[in-house]
Amino acid sequence: NALKRGHVNSITVFSKCHHGWAYHPSEANEMHPGLKFDLLDAEIKAAHEIGVKTPVYLSAGFDEKIAHKHPEWLRRPKDDRIGWEYPGFHELCMNSPYLDYLIAQIEEVVRNYDCDGIFLDIVGVRTCWCQNCVKTLLDEGKDPYNDENACELGERVYLNYTRRVREAVDRI
């Protein structure tokens, strides 16, 4: 009733949070251990019953669960410090196998749910000095610690990310 009274026409519902948990049964991820039902499906159905659209949120750049399982997928600063000693979330590099993991989650949501869009957060052009980014630049004969080279690679990595997401959604 509150949504109708407030003339709300769209609400963002969660597939995956910054902690990395899915809010629905998932083969591409793990469902939140405290959840015993498909919260995403219930939210979408309830919203659609009253004419409210439901874009689905996936935290793309942050996934603490996978960051701890695969620290080699983390985005690294030039000094190569991960930053575990500081509170907060740790960003993942889209030039790592994490991108395949994320694409599988996006495909699963688009294929299995009547969503009205996808909201991917914490993404953009980034500089990174993880082993994948350093290797890419070295393989190209470039100095990986030259900021201009790192920025140019960051633009290519983001372009590849956007292309892969678009291709995944268009396939479904």
Outline where the language-model segments fall.
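Aromatic- and glycine-enriched glycan-recognition loops and surfaces
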Residues: 1-6, 27-50, 100, 104, ...
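Aromatic-lined carbohydrate-binding/catalytic grooves of carbohydrate-active enzymes
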Residues: 4-39, 62-79, 83-86, 127-128, ...
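Short, well-ordered coil/turn segments that N-cap beta-strands
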Residues: 7-9, 48-54, 114-116, 171-172
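Hydrophobic faces of well-ordered beta-strands that scaffold small-molecule active sites
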Residues: 11-13, 54-58, 118-120
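Active-site-adjacent "subsite" loops/lids of carbohydrate-active enzymes
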Residues: 56-113, 163
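Active-site neighborhood of glycoside hydrolase catalytic domains
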Residues: 91-172
